Amino acid sequence: MARIAGINVPDHKHAVIALTAIFGIGKTRSQIICAASGIAESTKLKDLDETQIEALRTEVATFTVEGDLRREVSMNIKRLMDLGCYRGLRHRRSLPVRGQRSKTNARTRKGPRKAIKK
């Protein structure tokens, strides 16, 4: 298994699909990375030599991925909560943030039903 951006990327998959194992890299961004490093998308990672894997590492390093991206997202949510804006309040109360109805749905966000005490 090749190690890119601190993640063991599966080497039995095609390069485009294998790069999506890294948090912050989807299919489109992995296609951009493969094109910039001169690697065919259909090539499997186990068939690449060390210089090509190093080229992938340098291309991935230009993006914000994994721990840095997770930290950035959580800091953005924390900032909204500290501001006290509507979105921050919805995050704080564990309710849907983007305008979905919450009277009957939103069970995933709200968690399991709480029993009503009589």
Swiss-Prot record:
InterPro entries associated with the record: Rbsml_uS13_C, Ribosomal_uS13, Ribosomal_uS13-like_H2TH, Ribosomal_uS13_bac-type, Ribosomal_uS13_CS
UniProt keyword annotation of Iron-sulfur present: no
Keywords: Ribonucleoprotein, Ribosomal protein, RNA-binding, rRNA-binding, tRNA-binding
Ribonucleoprotein found in the keyword field: yes
BP-aspect Gene Ontology terms: translation
UniProt cross-references to SUPFAM superfamilies, sorted A to Z: S13-like H2TH domain
Gene Ontology MF terms: rRNA binding; structural constituent of ribosome; tRNA binding
Any one GO CC term of the record: small ribosomal subunit
Pfam family of the protein (one): Ribosomal_S13
Region feature Disordered, mapped onto this chain: 94-118
Gene3D superfamilies per the UniProt record, alphabetical: 1.10.8.50, 30s ribosomal protein s13, domain 2
Source superkingdom: Bacteria
Membership in a protein family: Belongs to the universal ribosomal protein uS13 family.
Biological role: Located at the top of the head of the 30S subunit, it contacts several helices of the 16S rRNA. In the 70S ribosome it contacts the 23S rRNA (bridge B1a) and protein L5 of the 50S subunit (bridge B1b), connecting the 2 subunits; these bridges are implicated in subunit movement. Contacts the tRNAs in the A and P-sites.
Subunit composition and interactions: Part of the 30S ribosomal subunit. Forms a loose heterodimer with protein S19. Forms two bridges to the 50S subunit in the 70S ribosome.
Protein name: Small ribosomal subunit protein uS13
Lineage: Bacteria, Pseudomonadati, Pseudomonadota, Gammaproteobacteria, Alteromonadales
Name of the encoding gene: rpsM1
